[in-house]
Amino acid sequence: MQDAEIVNEIHKLVEQEHNLERSHEGLELSADEQGRLRRIEETLDQCWDLLRQRRARRAAGQDPDSAEVRPKDIVEGYRQ
């Protein structure tokens, strides 16, 4: 996946996240909606991590295409 594709995916996920939150403003999310929101957040973390990996590899003179999506449990533990 190229940088522009990752950025587009990030934008789509952020829009989904905001739509879900806005549609329930002042209301509690159902268990299904909480799960959906959690999956969106996890996927966002993976996308940001992949984009950072690609940029770091490029800056170091390495092939950005060798960057790989890391498991959710790994990227969720990173400090932002």
Show which residues each predicted segment covers:
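Extended, charge-rich alpha-helical interface modules
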Residues: 1-80
